[in-house]
């Protein structure tokens, strides 16, 4: 069945979201049009504002409406000598939810992937290099994902940080809290054994 051009455009636009296929997009569009037009207008307004007003922090590259994000503009955290390097702004939120890290962040917005045309320039590594060269960074914590690309990115950044005599650490990988060994994959178990600590 052919929909009106506007309805078809709405459905196609909703499909840009991750995990939203044609049927899900159609259900969402019908829900907004049939039952909740007020919420649809609010969604449209929020999307429009977010797309035009949210940019990147000039210091750490996470999302913000200001030139500096709340963490970088904080007197206490913005002057911290510890920087945690992550791949995405979602990683910042995950670490912040734990409430244990009190330093600054640097968001790569991806990972090195030469086949996809993602090199050091796309990850903002020149800005990270300026942070390291400033002498204000004592420790760099590498919290990239434990994927091939994440590990390659971590090694590249570690080499860069060594030139500036910065202490480099990597977040631990291993068995999750509450996990059962029989369900953990062999690579994760190997990392757990290699990264064991004395008690």
UniProtKB/Swiss-Prot annotation:
Keyword field: DNA damage, DNA recombination, DNA repair, Metal-binding, Zinc, Zinc-finger
Domain Toprim, chain residue ranges per copy: 81-176
Listed GO biological process terms: DNA recombination; DNA repair
Any one GO molecular-function label of the UniProt entry: zinc ion binding
Annotated signal peptide: none
Family recorded in the similarity comment: Belongs to the RecR family.
Known function: May play a role in DNA repair. It seems to be involved in an RecBC-independent recombinational process of DNA repair. It may act with RecF and RecO.
UniProt xrefs under PANTHER family: RECOMBINATION PROTEIN RECR (PTHR30446:SF0)
Stated name of the protein: Recombination protein RecR
Organism annotation: Shewanella sp. (strain ANA-3)
Annotated gene: recR
């Amino acid at each position: 069945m052919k929909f009106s051009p506007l309805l078809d455009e709405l459905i196609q636009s909703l499909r840009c979201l991750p995990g939203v296929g044609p049927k899900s997009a159609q259900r969402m569009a019908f829900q907004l049009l049939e039952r909740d037009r007020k919420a649809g207008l609010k969604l449209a307004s929020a999307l429009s504002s977010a797309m035009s007003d949210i940019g990147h922090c000039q210091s750490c590259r996470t999302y913000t409406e200001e030139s500096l994000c709340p963490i970088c503009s904080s007197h206490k955290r913005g002057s911290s000598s510890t920087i945690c390097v992550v791949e995405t702004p979602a990683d910042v939120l995950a670490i912040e939810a734990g409430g244990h890290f009190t330093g600054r962040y640097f968001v790569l917005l991806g990972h090195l992937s030469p086949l996809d045309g993602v090199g050091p320039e796309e990850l903002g590594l020149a800005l990270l290099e300026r942070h390291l060269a400033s002498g204000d960074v004592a420790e760099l914590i590498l919290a990239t994902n434990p994927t091939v690309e994440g590990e390659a990115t971590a090694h590249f950044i570690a080499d860069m940080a060594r030139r500036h005599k910065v202490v480099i650490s990597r977040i631990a990988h291993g068995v999750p809290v509450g996990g059962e060994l029989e369900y953990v994959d062999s690579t994760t178990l190997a990392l757990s054994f290699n990264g064991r600590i004395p008690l």
